[in-house]
């Protein structure tokens, strides 16, 4: 049986931070479900990549999935303006399911009180936000802290994908 990975994504995501992990997960036999505030629409990445949204966040539950991916770009900042994406991500962490967040992706976790004491990385411009949320910020290509995998930039995708897949085993 194929595992399902939820992907929280909206307009202005960093294209390669969506396409590269999704390709890695699909090649490893996982199915991916794109989730935004409303289903059926198409969202566009910063460089023109199009993603059709499969499900609205109000129609899904973390228990339906085995892991969560949060790509970076401006998408996480737009998503966190609504409480539901953070609550959705919080359910994964609390249920010890993997959460993969790259670049600005950890922004979705900032308001959840889940970062306290965890080693986390992310894009340098959100470093202070992560520290203020209680995270131990690490400037490393990939950081694995319990069930959360984080990376800084698209340059870190190889390590990010590798550690994400390792956590899924």
Swiss-Prot record:
Signal peptide: none annotated. The keyword Signal does not apply. PANTHER family: DJ-1 PROTEIN, DJ-1_THIJ_PFPI FAMILY PROTEIN. Functions in the protection against aldehyde-stress, possibly by degrading damaged proteins. InterPro entries: C56_PfpI-like (IPR006286), Class_I_gatase-like (IPR029062), DJ-1/PfpI (IPR002818). It comes from the Bacteria. Pfam families: DJ-1_PfpI (PF01965). This is Putative cysteine protease YraA. One of its GO terms (biological process) is proteolysis. Keywords: Hydrolase, Protease, Stress response. Disruption phenotype: No aldehyde-stress related phenotype; when combined with a yfkM disruption shows significantly reduced growth in the presence of formaldehye and methylglyoxal. One of its GO terms (molecular function) is peptidase activity. The keyword Protease applies. Belongs to the peptidase C56 family. SUPFAM superfamilies: Class I glutamine amidotransferase-like (SSF52317). Induction: The adhR-yraA operon is induced by formaldehyde and methylgloxal, under the control of AdhR. A second yraA-specific transcription unit is not induced by formaldehyde or methylglyoxal and is not controlled by AdhR. Transcribed under partial control of SigM ECF sigma factor. Residues 3-169 form the PfpI endopeptidase domain. The active site is at residues 103-104. Its EC number is 3.2.-.-.
């Amino acid at each position: 049986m194929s595992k399902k990975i939820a992907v929280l994504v909206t307009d202005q995501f960093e294209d390669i931070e969506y396409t590269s992990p999704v390709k890695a997960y699909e090649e490893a036999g996982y199915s991916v479900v794109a989730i935004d505030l409303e289903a059926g629409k198409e969202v566009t990445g910063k460089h023109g990549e199009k993603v059709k949204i499969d499900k609205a966040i109000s129609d899904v539950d973390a228990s339906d999935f085995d892991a969560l991916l949060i790509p970076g770009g401006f998408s996480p900042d737009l998503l966190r303006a609504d409480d539901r994406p953070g609550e959705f991500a919080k359910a994964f962490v609390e249920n010890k399911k993997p959460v993969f967040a790259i670049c600005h992706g950890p922004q979705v976790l900032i308001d959840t009180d889940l970062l306290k004491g965890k080693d986390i990385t992310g894009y340098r411009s959100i470093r202070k936000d992560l520290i203020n949320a209680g995270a131990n910020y690490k400037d490393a290509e990939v950081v694995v802290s319990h069930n959360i995998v984080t990376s800084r930039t698209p340059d870190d995708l190889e390590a990010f994908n590798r550690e994400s897949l390792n956590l899924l085993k």
